[in-house]
Amino acid sequence: MKRVAMGPVWLALAMAPMMATSASAQVQLDTPAGGWRATSGAQKDFLQEVNYPAANVNANGRSAVALIQGRIHTLPKPKGAGAGDDDAARQPARLVVDGVALPLSLNEDGGFARPWSFGSGAHGVEVRAPGTGVARRTQFIEAGARTGVKLRVVLSWDSDGTDLDLHVVAPDGQHVFYGDRVAANGGALDVDVTTGFGPEIYASPTPPAGAWHVYVNYYGAGERRDVITVAQLAVITDEGTPRERQQVFRVPMRKPGELTRVRSFQLP
């Protein structure tokens, strides 16, 4: 019987599967679960509660079928943090839903709960831990009769403690923004985030045909006046169908008060 010495290379290869398992365990994704599901009943409310002055993405009153929820167990030290520094910038996780990437704010214990309205069909969700990039992915098929989103506009940005606002003007002149979040034509804005990162999401199941205009306003940055933040705008049409189209735009926002028309487009 031959004996084979376990050198450093062999040891690393032997431990690789265990290391991968340990890394993936850092990211816990409770819902949505992978596989096949048929959600029954009325579709959950798209709108979130807004409580000023510090308004965040929140999951108040949502059932599990309308949430992306879980926990990241190992968090990096906040950027610029020192001993006793409670004001260091947060580092968000990264959420990717059906190919659209956006920041995911975390609680102090690493927990997250992001409302999301999934239509019928196949969906993919990925959560990436900040700093390490360790990810957890799931795919599922929603077989229930769910209302599809024919137009979704997602605004996110890359700085903490800043307030950017999404403004969507429909062809019929209806203007949806934080001051008027629900339009008579069926379009709605889910939340007004005032504490950094976003996202703010406009969605419509029946967008009227014609010219659409999307603006981003740099509303404020607290006492700071020199915070440059990069806004990301994703425009998704015919979501979950063979005709689905995604476009992503990135625009630097240099100072509070700046209003930028990011995208104009036509819908048939």
Task: Name each region found by the language model.
Residues 25-62:
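Short, compositionally biased P/S/T/A/G/V-rich stretches that sit at domain boundaries
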Residues 115-122, 208:
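Surface-exposed, short loops/turns at beta-strand junctions within beta-sandwich domains
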Residues 134-143:
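Edge beta-strands of extracellular beta-sandwich domains
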